[in-house]
Amino acid sequence: DFNKKLVWRTNEGFNVKPMYRAEDTENLKTTDSRPGEYPYIRGTKSDNNWLIRQEIIVDDVTVANKKANDILTKGVNSLGFHVEEAHITPENMAALLKDIDVENIEINFHTCIKNAAKLIETTGAYYKSIHVDTTKAKGSFNYDPFKRMLKRGRDFANYATQAASLIKSASELLPKFR
C-alpha cells in the first residue's frame, strides 16, 4: 500500500509524500514568487552563492597561516580561526593573516568571552595597519556567552552588557563583520 509504505507521517501532523507531481504544486504561492523578492517565501537571496568555509584550530600561527593559504588554493573562500588568548597579539595577527586577501576572503574568529574584546581590537588595528577597506572585509567574531556558566557553574557577570559592547565596537571597527 502506497500510503503505508511510502508516505512519511511527521510528529507535527502532516504527511510527506516521497514524490510530487505538477498538480500537487499548482496552487502553491512558491511557484510564482522569486527568490529575493517579497514575501520572501523562497528566501532573501536572489542568487545561490555559498561560501566554502574551513575551520582551523590555531596552535601555532605560522602553521595555521600555511594551512590557510594552502586550502585557499583549493576552493575555500571563508576561513574560521579558533584562537586562544596567547595568540591574540598584533605580531601573531600579522603572521596568521599573512598573504591572505582579507577584503575578498571571509575571516571568522572563535574565542572565549574573556578574549573577544582584545581579539576585536587587535583585528581592527591590524586591518587598519595594512590599509584594508573595511567596507569590503567580511567575517565574524564568535564566542559562547553561556559556556562558562554551563561548563563550570559560574556566572559571568554582565554578559549581556558585555555582548552589546562587543557588538558595538566590532561594528565600528569592522562594519561588515557579524
Give the ranges of each region predicted by the language model.
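Catalytic alpha/beta active-site cores
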Residues: 1-178
